[in-house]
C-alpha cells in the first residue's frame, strides 16, 4: 500500500451514498471533518481565492465562523487580532446582506433584489453566495428549502442575463437535514422558479448522526 488510500472502495461507496441521500451529483463524507465549522471551513477554503467576494445573504453567520472569515466578535468587517490565516487574511472579501426587516412574515426572507443588485454591481468578483439555513443564535426563522432554491434561481438568472460565471451558491445545511422531503441541492419535479444549490455542507454530529455521532461532516453538490 502507498498509504494514500487510492482505490479505497469503501470510502468511494460511502461518498456515493452521501450524494444519493441528498440527491446530489457528488458527495464527500468523512469522520476527519470534526465539526460543522470545520466542514464549512474546508468548503470555503477550497473554493475561495484572493480577490474573491463571498456574499452572505442571511446576515452574519455563526459566531464560530468569525475566525474563519476574519471578522471580529461583533461581526464588523475588520480583521481581528487573531485573524492570521483567515479568509480575509488571504485576500477574500467578505460581505453580507441582512434578511428583510420582518423575515417571519415574508414569503421570501432573503432580500433578493439587494442580492441581485449586488451581483450586477460586482459581477464575477462575487465568487460565492452563502446561505445559512438555520437561525443559529439570531432571532429569525430557519429558511425553507423552497426559499433557498428560489434565491439560487435568481442568482442563476442574473448571471445568465449578464453573461458571467455564476457564483457558487453554498448552503450551510446544519440542523436542516431531513426536516423536509427534499434538500437544497435537489429540485423536485413541478417546482417553479427554483434552482439547486451548488454546494451544501453540514455536520454528522447533528441531524444525520441522530445525536450519536461524536465527529464527522459532509459536503455534497455538483460534481464540479
Tell me what each language-model feature is.
Residues 1:
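N-terminal glycine-rich, Lys/His-bearing helix-loop that initiates the first secondary-structure elements
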Residues 5-8, 13, 17, 26-27, ...:
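Conserved PLP-enzyme active-site core in the AAT-like
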Residues 23:
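Metal-dependent phosphohydrolase cores
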Amino acid at each position: 500500500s502507498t498509504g494514500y488510500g487510492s482505490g479505497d472502495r469503501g470510502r468511494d461507496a460511502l461518498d456515493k451514498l452521501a450524494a444519493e441521500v441528498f440527491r446530489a451529483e457528488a458527495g464527500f463524507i468523512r469522520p476527519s471533518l470534526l465539526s460543522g465549522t470545520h466542514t464549512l471551513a474546508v468548503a470555503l477554503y477550497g473554493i475561495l481565492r484572493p480577490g474573491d467576494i463571498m456574499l452572505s445573504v442571511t446576515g452574519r453567520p455563526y459566531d464560530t465562523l468569525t475566525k474563519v472569515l476574519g471578522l471580529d466578535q461583533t461581526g464588523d468587517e475588520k480583521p481581528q487580532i487573531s485573524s492570521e490565516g483567515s479568509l480575509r487574511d488571504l485576500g477574500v472579501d467578505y460581505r453580507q446582506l441582512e434578511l428583510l426587516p420582518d423575515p417571519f412574515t415574508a414569503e421570501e426572507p432573503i432580500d433578493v433584489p439587494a442580492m441581485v443588485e449586488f451581483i450586477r454591481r460586482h459581477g464575477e468578483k462575487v465568487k460565492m453566495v452563502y446561505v445559512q439555513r438555520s437561525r443559529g443564535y439570531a432571532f429569525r426563522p430557519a429558511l425553507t428549502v423552497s426559499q433557498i432554491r428560489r434565491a439560487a434561481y435568481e442568482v442563476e438568472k442574473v448571471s445568465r442575463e449578464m453573461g458571467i460565471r455564476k457564483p457558487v451558491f453554498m448552503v450551510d445545511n446544519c440542523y436542516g437535514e431531513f426536516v423536509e422531503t427534499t434538500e437544497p441541492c435537489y429540485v423536485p419535479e413541478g417546482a417553479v422558479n427554483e434552482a439547486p444549490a451548488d454546494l451544501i455542507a453540514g455536520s454528522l454530529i447533528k441531524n444525520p448522526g441522530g445525536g450519536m455521532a461524536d465527529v464527522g461532516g459532509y459536503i455534497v453538490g455538483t460534481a464540479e
